[in-house]
Every structure is written in structure tokens, then in C-alpha cells.
């Protein structure tokens, strides 16, 4: 589904270089120290950064130079980027038509995702009238209503309390499994990664330093566990 082949981006003349393959329907966590290049990797996939070299394939098609708006990708950030002057219904509708002129089919898609997110009763409210968790549900709904096969999450739930964060992670995982979406999620928490991502990637110094089973990383048995401050549980 998703393949990066020597995708390179120059950061202060120092190259970050990524080679990666992710299958359709996989849920993968991206972990690593602060400043390692995790968000850079997602931004390269989404098209917000242009690589200096390399190839990016999605579903077998070359999207190395495709503008972000035309890539088969949706991305959700920690800052949800909801428009404060638009209500929930309109914010979700932006994912279908920036002009907010929706046909009957699009209106049904909008309403269906709102029901799935549990926010159908909030459709006439403005973002400022919502809790943090509700705002992230609206932002996630706007991503999912686009029906793109790849979903990128850049720590969108890190500001939520542990109970809400776990609730959102479970919701995302269930939807991705139901729709066979390919998920890549940046996180600082290996525990969060283990909840939804059987596979993890560790980024360090602008490279993929390790990839494998999240459980192995969490147990301290992986070579990259020390990068995340995880010690082996074996005495």
C-alpha cells in the first residue's frame, strides 16, 4: 500500500532518509526521541514537505510530487485546525467540499461519520463550545469522511486525559480495521502504541533505526528499546 524508497529531506543540510513499506490495513506506530524526525516522516508522506530525492508510492502509484490535496492520505494533528466560525456540521463538510455545497450523498456521508463518532447531537455547535475530546472527534470525522486509504496521526490525542486518550485510540483502531485503512501514528508513548499498533518503527537521527513488533519493544528486548528509555524486564 505505502512504500518509501530512499525518500530524503535536507534539514540544515543534514539529510533525513527513509525507506519503509507498510501493507494495506496495517496499524503502525512511529516512535523515537524528540527531534528525531517522526513528524518529518509523516509530513513527507502527506506532501507537506517535498523530498530532495527518492520515491513515494501509494497503492502502486507514484505520489512523490503529488500536491497534498490530491494525495490519497488524511492527516490529523495535535492541533485540530477546526474553523472557529464554522459549526461541527460545516467543519466535517469541509472534508467533502471546501465550498460546503454538499449533494445528498455527501450529506449522508457527513451524517453517518458523525453518528459513528458519537457527535451527531453536536452538529450545530461551534468548536469553542466543545470539550477537547469532542473537538478531536470532529477533526477525526473530517479526516475520515474523505475516505482516503491512508490515515496519518501526529499525536492528536496527547493533550487528552488517559481515559479519553484510550477511548480515542480504540475508536481509531476499530474504524481502521473496519475500513481496512492503513494507519501510521506518531506517539511518544509506547504504551499507547501497544494498544493499537502491532508493529512499531523507531526513528532516530533522521533514519529508521528499528522496526518490528511493538510488544518486543515494550518488553525491553529490542535493540531500540534503550532509545526510548525502556529497560529489559529480564533479570
From Swiss-Prot:
GO cellular component terms, semicolon-separated: plasma membrane
Record organism: Salmonella choleraesuis (strain SC-B67)
Family in the record: Belongs to the ABC transporter superfamily. Thiamine importer (TC 3.A.1.19.1) family.
Name of protein: Thiamine import ATP-binding protein ThiQ
The reaction(s) this protein catalyses: thiamine(out) + ATP + H2O = thiamine(in) + ADP + phosphate + H(+)
Residues bound to ATP: 32-39
Lipid biosynthesis recorded as keyword: no
Membrane topology: Peripheral membrane protein
GO molecular function: ABC-type thiamine transporter activity; ATP binding; ATP hydrolysis activity
Amino acid at each position: 500500500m505505502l512504500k518509501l524508497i530512499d525518500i530524503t529531506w535536507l534539514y540544515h543540510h543534514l539529510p533525513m532518509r527513509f525507506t519503509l513499506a507498510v501493507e494495506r490495513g496495517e496499524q503502525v506506530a512511529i516512535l523515537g526521541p524528540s527531534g528525531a524526525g517522526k513528524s518529518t516522516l509523516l509530513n513527507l508522506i502527506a506532501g507537506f514537505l517535498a523530498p530532495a530525492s527518492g520515491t513515494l508510492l501509494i497503492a502502486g502509484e507514484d505520489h512523490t510530487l503529488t500536491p497534498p490535496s490530491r494525495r490519497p492520505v488524511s492527516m490529523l494533528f495535535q492541533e485540530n485546525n477546526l474553523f472557529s466560525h464554522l459549526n461541527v456540521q460545516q467543519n466535517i463538510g469541509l472534508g467533502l467540499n471546501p465550498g460546503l455545497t454538499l449533494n445528498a450523498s455527501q450529506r449522508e456521508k457527513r451524517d453517518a461519520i458523525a453518528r459513528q463518532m458519537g457527535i451527531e447531537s453536536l452538529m450545530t455547535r461551534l468548536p469553542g463550545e466543545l470539550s477537547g475530546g469532542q473537538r478531536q472527534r470532529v477533526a477525526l470525522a473530517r479526516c475520515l469522511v474523505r475516505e482516503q486509504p491512508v490515515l496519518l496521526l501526529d499525536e492528536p490525542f496527547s493533550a487528552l486525559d488517559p481515559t479519553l486518550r484510550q477511548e480515542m485510540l480504540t475508536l481509531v483502531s476499530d474504524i481502521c480495521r473496519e475500513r481496512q485503512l492503513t494507519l501510521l501514528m506518531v506517539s511518544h508513548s509506547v504504551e499507547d502504541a501497544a494498544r493499537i499498533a502491532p508493529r512499531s518503527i523507531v526513528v532516530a537521527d533522521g533514519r529508521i533505526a528499528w522496526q518490528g513488533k511493538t510488544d518486543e519493544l515494550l518488553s525491553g528486548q529490542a535493540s531500540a528499546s534503550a532509545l526510548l528509555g525502556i529497560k529489559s524486564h529480564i533479570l
